[in-house]
Swiss-Prot record:
It comes from Arabidopsis thaliana (Mouse-ear cress). The gene is BZIP29. Its main location: cytoplasm. This is bZIP transcription factor 29. Residues 120-132, 249-263 have a biased composition (Basic and acidic residues). Residues 1-199, 244-312, 333-356, 517-547 are annotated as: Disordered.
Length: 547
């Protein structure tokens, strides 16, 4: 116990030296007004790194349990504005207030089961109200287990009425280092059941705490030194190239969540493990606005009705460990839980508009194995987001893809040339076919004319053959007639010779006859006269006989 008290005083002194005395610190309640258990004062406030100390830091919230002081948690404070339906303790107007019911934006430990039940967390308390001590209370509340114990005043904090109970969780602080509060995880659901009004009355007495931190060095000096080393390493601009190469190696191994966390830390959007997401507004105000909006969304879901008292059971609850942070069973797709983009994470993404930028080309050459790609390949990669993301994890595959695209382009070009040549040949053949068809028509016309002439000649030849046959027949007829005439002429000449002979004989005989006749002429004359007379006589007789 002596060592623990010494350690607690040591931690409070360091806390005061880190943050100083602030005007918004919580006044301490006198011990006489609190029913404190000395067994629960062992855990002290965690150390905050000096680079994030600010005199204007916001303070914690009222205690969540009236009789117990569990170990304080540094992960429950989210800056938010006062809701219209919340209790208004300050008549002074719209002052900035803090709500205990709002979890951290992305992966705070309020989204995990808390160490102790806190049925009075759904309240927004103004910091100036606590400073001025305006709460005229009938009940004194001890310091909340989820507030920072950096106050130096001695006045007591009083509230006018008890806050409505809400759903509470239990969890262990020791398993997760403070640096993992930037991880966008969905908190695991604890086993829970509702209690009646009588059970809620006895719950605060019978519910034990789960786990208490006994060593102040685990959350104190160790976390502070670790976070100082992390920020000094990541904020060193000379190590950006080493970070890029290490992130590329981690992405090959599948640790993309850790890369996003480290790049967001390097950009200065996250603070050390003891600060909440709301307290980093001095580093990155835009990220703070996004975290406030997501915190308000989750607060509206986690609110319960004022009349319904819900308390967890005494059964065992799981605590999220480092190993479960990287399990793929948890949901990483909720857009409201994703952290705002930081320069560290955006440097790994390449858009087509960055293709002309020389700095992006240099970053690419460092990422892609120190200039493995040529300038033309770099332009193609930067023009395509998918290729750029793939080049981070597997540059050889991107190289193969680009080579395949080039070969495909060459083959396509050859194919197009071949198609053009074939089209030219087809056109040439078509023109030749047209000319040949024209010549063929002319030849067909000539052939038709020649066939007609041939037919005419055939007819004429046939006619001439007929004429020749007729001439031959005529010649034969003429030859026969000539022969017949010749024969006729030969017979006539013989007859003439015979006639000449006969005429000569007849002349001689006529001369002899004449001589003889001349000699016999008077005799003949007489005979003739006698014959005539005889004839006359006969004729006369005949005529007479006839008469």
């Amino acid at each position: 116990m002596g060592d623990t008290e010494k350690c607690n005083s040591d931690m409070i002194q360091r806390l005061h030296s880190s943050f100083g005395t602030t005007s918004s610190s919580i006044p301490k309640n006198p011990i006489s007004q609190l029913d404190l258990n000395p067994n629960f004062i062992r855990s002290s406030a965690p150390q905050f790194s000096k680079p994030f100390s600010d005199s204007g830091k916001r303070i914690g919230v009222p205690p969540s349990h009236p009789n117990l002081i569990p170990p304080t948690s540094p992960f429950s404070q989210i800056p938010t504005t006062r809701q219209p339906g919340s209790h208004n303790f300050n008549p002074g107007g719209a002052n900035h207030s803090r709500s205990m019911s709002q979890p951290n934006s992305f992966f705070s430990f309020d989204s995990l089961p808390p160490l102790s039940p806190s049925p009075f967390r759904d309240h927004d308390v103004s910091m100036e109200d606590r400073d001025s001590g305006v709460f005229n209370s009938n009940h004194s509340l001890p310091p909340s287990p989820f507030t920072r114990c950096n106050s130096t005043s001695s006045s007591s904090l009083r509230v006018g009425e008890s806050l409505p109970p809400r759903k509470s969780h239990r969890r262990s602080n020791s398993d997760i280092p403070s640096g993992f509060n930037s991880m966008p995880l969905i908190p695991p659901r604890p086993l829970e059941r509702s209690f009646s009004g009588g059970e809620c009355a006895d719950w605060s007495k019978s519910n034990p705490f789960v786990k208490k931190e006994s060593s102040c060095e685990r959350e104190g000096v160790g976390e502070r030194e670790a976070m100082d080393d992390l920020f000094s390493a990541y904020m060193n601009l000379e190590n950006i190239d080493v970070l890029n190469s290490s992130e590329a190696d981690d992405s090959k191994n599948g640790n993309e969540n850790r890369d996003d966390m480290e790049s967001s830390r390097a950009s200065g959007t996250k603070t050390n493990g003891s600060d909440t997401e709301g307290e980093s507004s001095s580093v990155n105000e835009s990220a703070n606005n996004n975290m406030n909006s997501s915190g308000e969304k989750r607060e509206s879901v986690k609110r319960r009705a004022a009349g319904g008292d819900i308390a967890p059971t005494t059964r065992h609850y799981r605590s999220v460990s480092v190993d479960s942070c990287f399990m793929e069973k948890l949901s990483f797709g909720d857009e409201s839980l994703k952290p705002p983009p930081s320069p560290g994470s955006m440097s790994r993404k390449v858009s087509p508009t960055n293709s002309v930028d020389g700095n992006s080309g240099a970053a690419f050459s460092i990422e892609f194995n120190n200039g493995e790609f040529t300038a033309a390949e770099m332009k193609k990669i930067m023009a395509n987001d998918k290729l750029a993301e793939m080049a981070m994890s597997d540059p050889k595959r991107v190289k193969r893809i680009l080579a395949n695209r080039q070969s495909a382009a060459r083959s396509k070009e050859r194919k197009m040339r071949y198609i053009v040549e074939l089209e030219h040949k087809v056109q040439t053949l078509q023109t030749e076919a047209t000319t040949l068809s024209a010549q063929l028509t002319l030849l067909q016309r000539d052939m038709m004319g020649l066939t007609n002439q041939n037919n005419e000649l055939k007819f004429r030849l046939q006619a001439m053959e007929q004429q020749a046959r007729l001439r031959d027949a005529l010649n034969e007829a003429l030859n026969g007639e000539v022969q017949r005439l010749k024969l006729a002429i030969g017979e006539s000449s013989q007859n003439e010779s015979e006639r000449s002979k006969m005429q000569s004989l007849n002349a001689e005989m006529f001369q002899q006859l004449n001589i003889s006749q001349l000699r016999q002429q008077p005799q003949q004359m007489q005979q003739q006269s006698h014959q005539q007379n005889h004839q006359n006589g006969t004729m006369a007789t005949k005529s007479e006989s006839n008469e």
